[in-house]
Amino acid sequence: KGDFSMKTKAYTYPSASALATIHAWQWYPEDGNVKAVLLLHHGMAEHCGRYGDFLQAFADMGYAVFMHDMLGHGQSCETPEDRGFFGDKDGYNALLQDVRRLYDIARGEYPDKKMVIAGHSMGSFIMRCFTARYPDLDYAAAIYVGTGGPNPLANISVAVTNVLGAVKGKRYRSKWLENTGFKGYNDHFEGRTSVDWLSRDTASVDDYVADDACGFTFTVAAYGDLGRLMLECGSKDWYARVPKDLPILFVSGQEDPVSNYGAGIRAVSDRLKATGHTRVQVLLYPGARHEILRETNSPEVYRDIDAFITKAVLQAK
């Protein structure tokens, strides 16, 4: 929504799952003068179309931003039945392979520019896994937005989804599972809607509620994939594989239930530091909720992310 002046370029490629064609885009400055490349992954049950303000701000600051509608989301979804479904098995691996394809496109478009990888919410778990699976690719920093800490329920979640999938089918959508997964998220807030936890920006929350392509229920197979992603990026192996000298920024609202109100992000960042990672930074914004890129203080967040990239990547010796 709104009038945006940045330029765009579209791409399509087959998902590694063979379920759909992935739709991806590049947004870049009107004058074509690109200072750095940002590869950003959106979150669960949403799509790239929600990021217009972010994309305009970053194009104005000189970035070429690459995003794709994740498999089973937005335009990367062939039928309503495919929404929130990544495949009968190994869907989480397909998600990571689809990101690798977008990385290759972005790198091909800008072979000489510094690249930063980033993800919001579920996208942060995907990009955290991506960082450890592909530590030798040519990216200069990682930004994890609205991510979570160690989740003791992830193992149970995977087991439950396996059972439900076997009994009800992989595409079964369990309201019980959804309610359990997001239990308590909204208790902290006004209760104006069921998703007040997303943002203090009521217009943004209302847009989410009104958007048919947002807020849908995941299939049990996809919940299993999400659980596996969380297990992978919470494992000892993850901390061992993430490059020790990679600049890493965690960005979250202090009132974000996904990050356990900041405690989860602190736990991950502290463990990274304890395992020899020397360039870890945390930005927590008082009062802000989960969708920190669609918050009342988002312009401040955008400036802070740009400042991090400028210092850690563009001015780095």
Which stretches of residues belong to each language-model region?
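Alpha/beta-hydrolase fold nucleophile elbow
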Residues: Y110-S121
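Alpha/beta-hydrolase active-site loop
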Residues: G87-R107
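N-terminal cap/lid segment of alpha/beta-hydrolase-fold proteins
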Residues: M6-P29
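Alpha/beta-hydrolase-fold enzymes
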Residues: A118, M127-A213
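Catalytic active-site module of serine/aspartate enzymes centered on a nucleophile-bearing elbow/loop
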Residues: T275, R279-K317
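Active-site glycine-rich loops that stabilize anionic/oxyanionic intermediates
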Residues: H42-E46, Q254-E255
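Conserved alpha/beta-hydrolase
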Residues: A57-E81
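Short beta-strand/loop motif that positions the catalytic acidic residue
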Residues: F250-S252
